[in-house]
C-alpha cells in the first residue's frame, strides 16, 4: 500500500466515523427531544378521567404496554424508562386508580407508587337495623362479599366479637374505602368507630347514671332518639327514662316494641303488641 493510498484510506475512514458520530448525535438529540415532549404532555383520557385497575403482580413494562394499547400514552418504552429513572419500577401498588386528563406520565407513576386509589362511600344510617346494614353492604358492587352466613351471632364471631349483640354496634357515619374492601373489613371499621365514640362518651358521663356499661348508654340514647326527632326534647325524655331506671321501673317505650316487631310492623301498635314479649320490649322486660 502506497503512502497516498494509506492517507486516502484513513481520510475515508475519518469521514465515515464523523458521519456516524453526527448521525448518532442527531439521533440522540431527536430521542432526547421526543423524551422531553413525552414528559411534558398530558395523558390521553376523557374529561371525566379513566378508572384503571393495576393488578397485583403486574409490572412497569406491562403497565406501559396496556396504557399504550388503551391510547392513554403513545410511547410505552419511554414510560418504562421514566419509571426506572424515578426509581418507581418496583414501588407501584395494586389497586383501582382514576387517571385524570391533566396528568403527565410522571404524575401517573407517582399516583400508583403512592397507592392513592379511587375511593367509594357508604353510609351507615342512624336507626338502621343490623339486617338492613348487612343487606346494604351485600348490595354494594365495590365491597367484596366474604360472609357466607346469615346468622347474626356467627357474623359477630367472624368480626372478632363473639357473644356480642350486633344491634347498635356500628357507628352511623359515611365511610370511604377502595374497591375490594371486604364486608368484614367494612363492618369492623364501623364497629371500631362506634367503640371509640362510646368510650369517649362513657368517660364524660354523669357518675350517678343508673347504667353499668357503655353499651347500656348506647341503648338508652337510641331509645331516646326514637322517641322524638326534636333535639330540644331529648334531654327531658332522657331524664324521665333515667328516673324510671333509678326506681327500678320498666321504661315502657313504644320504639322498643316496634324494634322487636321487625318487618311485621305496619305503622300501628296494638295492645297485643305491647304484651308480646321480645328481647327489646320494655313493656314486658326490665331495664
What are these regions (language model features)?
Residues 2-47:
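N-terminal type II signal-anchor transmembrane helix
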Residues 31-199:
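Signal peptide-directed extracytoplasmic domains
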Residues 59, 135, 141-147, 156-287:
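Bacterial extracytoplasmic/cell-wall-associated proteins, especially those involved in peptidoglycan
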Residues 22-25, 87, 270:
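Alpha-helical interaction segments
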Amino acid at each position: 500500500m502506497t503512502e497516498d493510498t494509506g492517507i486516502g484510506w484513513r481520510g475515508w475512514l475519518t469521514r465515515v466515523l464523523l458521519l456516524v458520530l453526527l448521525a448518532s448525535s442527531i439521533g440522540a438529540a431527536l430521542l432526547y427531544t421526543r423524551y422531553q415532549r413525552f414528559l411534558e404532555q398530558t395523558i390521553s383520557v376523557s374529561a371525566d378521567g379513566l378508572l384503571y385497575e393495576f393488578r397485583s403482580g403486574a409490572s412497569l413494562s406491562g403497565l406501559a404496554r396496556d396504557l399504550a394499547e388503551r391510547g392513554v400514552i403513545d410511547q410505552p418504552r419511554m414510560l418504562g424508562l421514566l419509571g426506572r429513572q424515578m426509581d418507581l419500577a418496583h414501588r407501584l401498588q395494586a389497586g383501582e386508580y382514576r387517571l385524570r386528563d391533566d396528568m403527565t406520565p410522571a404524575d401517573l407513576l407517582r399516583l400508583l407508587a403512592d397507592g392513592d386509589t379511587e375511593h367509594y362511600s357508604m353510609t351507615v344510617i342512624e336507626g338502621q337495623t343490623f339486617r338492613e346494614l348487612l343487606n346494604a353492604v351485600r348490595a354494594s358492587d365495590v365491597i367484596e362479599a366474604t360472609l357466607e352466613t346469615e346468622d347474626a351471632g356467627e357474623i359477630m364471631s367472624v368480626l372478632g366479637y363473639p357473644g356480642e349483640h350486633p344491634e347498635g354496634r356500628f357507628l352511623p357515619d359515611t365511610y370511604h374505602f377502595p374497591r375490594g374492601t371486604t364486608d368484614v373489613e367494612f363492618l369492623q371499621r364501623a364497629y371500631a368507630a362506634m367503640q371509640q365514640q362510646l368510650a369517649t362518651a362513657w368517660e364524660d358521663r354523669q357518675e350517678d347514671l343508673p347504667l353499668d356499661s357503655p353499651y347500656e348508654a348506647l341503648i338508652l340514647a337510641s331509645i331516646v332518639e326514637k322517641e322524638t326527632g326534636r333535639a330540644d326534647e331529648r334531654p327531658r325524655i332522657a331524664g324521665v327514662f333515667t328516673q324510671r331506671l333509678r326506681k327500678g321501673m320498666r321504661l315502657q317505650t313504644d320504639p322498643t316494641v316496634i324494634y322487636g316487631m321487625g318487618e311485621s310492623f305496619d305503622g300501628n301498635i296494638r295492645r297485643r303488641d305491647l304484651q308480646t314479649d321480645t328481647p327489646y320490649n320494655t313493656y314486658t322486660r326490665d331495664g
